[in-house]
Amino acid sequence: MATTWPPRTVIRKSSGLRTLESALQRSGLGPVAGVDEVGRGACAGPLVVAACALGPNRYESLAALDDSKKLTEKTREKLFPLICRYALAYHVVFIPSVEVDRRGVHVANIEGMRRAVAGLSVRPGYVLSDGFRVPGLSVPSLPVIGGDAAAACIAAASVLAKVSRDRLMVAMDTQYPGYGFAEHKGYSTRAHTLALTQLGPCPEHRRSFINVRRVATRSNGAAAAEREADPPQERDGTG
């Protein structure tokens, strides 16, 4: 008989974030994978999506798991290798800023979730996503509001995505100095806005975001005005 959601097994209160996974596992719908994204609201840098399937006996090893936004950087960095070690499978996808601009944030996010799940080395029996329905998956799925604080597999995916993106933004700070990417990770803080105004957008800024587009428009207008005010000297071609 085919299993369906909601499972007939009663969802009982259990320790940590394992309630949803435990119910699905008991109903024969495992392994259960969680999928989550980081960087959706940033105006610079990639959108990063991770999928993670945890083994049913690995929750105690990851007792500190929680929504990545609630964890300190130190705790996230400590959890990252543990998740990689104890996960049945995980996959991290980077959606570059140019693709975010081309597709739009929401469409890029859904596509990233599809890619992350498809990239898992173990095919999940069920997928839990953080808040968004993910059409086009080859397995049953369920959006969970506040999922990164309600399901261990989503929390694990959240940590994988957050740490992966933060590390990339720190490296980007060296590639594009002056913007402070290592500090604000591409989000629109006051310091980032000031740097963006002074330096103009770099290739990693998302032109589809209005604050970046305004600065880019002003920069292009100023450059055009400068060219008109100081036209190039004519040359006779004789060298």
From Swiss-Prot:
Q: Where does the RNase H type-2 domain lie?
A: 30-221
GO terms classed as biological process: DNA replication, removal of RNA primer; mismatch repair
- According to the lineage, what is the superkingdom? Bacteria
Q: InterPro entries per the record?
A: RNase_HII, RNase_HII/HIII, RNase_HII/HIII_dom, RNaseH-like_sf, RNaseH_sf
Q: Where does a divalent metal cation bind?
A: 36-37, 130
Q: Which cofactor does it need?
A: Mn(2+); Mg(2+)
Q: What does this protein do?
A: Endonuclease that specifically degrades the RNA of RNA-DNA hybrids.
Q: Which family does it belong to?
A: Belongs to the RNase HII family.
Indicate what this protein is called per its UniProt record. Ribonuclease HII
Organism listed in the record: Mycobacterium marinum (strain ATCC BAA-535 / M)
